[in-house]
Structure formats: C-alpha cells, structure tokens
C-alpha cells in the first residue's frame, strides 16, 4: 500500500511541475509561436517545444 501512495505522490508532483512550467494543466506541444496562438489565450511564445501559456 505504501508503494501505491508513493507512486501517486510522484505523479501528483510531476503534474504540478508541468502545470507550473507551462502555466496550464496540460503540456501543449508546439513547433512555432503560431501554434501557441491558436491553442492558448494571450498569444504566448513557443519555448523548448511547449507553449508558455499563462
């Protein structure tokens, strides 16, 4: 049971880290800034292959 909770905690921390880095609960992949302008409000830039949504 402890292993299950440890895995659950790791998944929660990783998802929060992705949320914090990208500003959204989902990591939105992009190739150009134009991809992000269609997927995120506020015309964000594409950094390291992911949209910098706010």
From Swiss-Prot:
PTM annotation, UniProt: Probably has three disulfide bridges.
Keywords: Disulfide bond, Ion channel impairing toxin, Neurotoxin, Potassium channel impairing toxin, Secreted, Signal, Toxin
Keyword ATP-binding annotated: no
One Gene Ontology MF term: potassium channel regulator activity
Primary location: secreted
Cross-referenced SUPFAM superfamilies: Scorpion toxin-like (SSF57095)
Tissue: Expressed by the venom gland.
Family that this chain belongs to: Belongs to the short scorpion toxin superfamily. Potassium channel inhibitor family. Alpha-KTx 14 subfamily.
Task of the protein: Potential blocker of potassium channels.
Domain note: Has the structural arrangement of an alpha-helix connected to antiparallel beta-sheets by disulfide bonds (CS-alpha/beta).
Record protein name field: Potassium channel toxin alpha-KTx 14.1
Species: Olivierus martensii (Manchurian scorpion)
């Amino acid at each position: 049971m402890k292993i299950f909770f440890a895995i659950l905690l790791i998944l929660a921390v990783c998802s929060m880290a992705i949320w914090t880095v990208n500003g959204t609960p989902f990591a939105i992949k992009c190739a150009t800034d134009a991809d992000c302008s269609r997927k995120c409000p506020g015309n964000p830039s594409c950094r390291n292959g992911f949209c910098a949504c706010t």
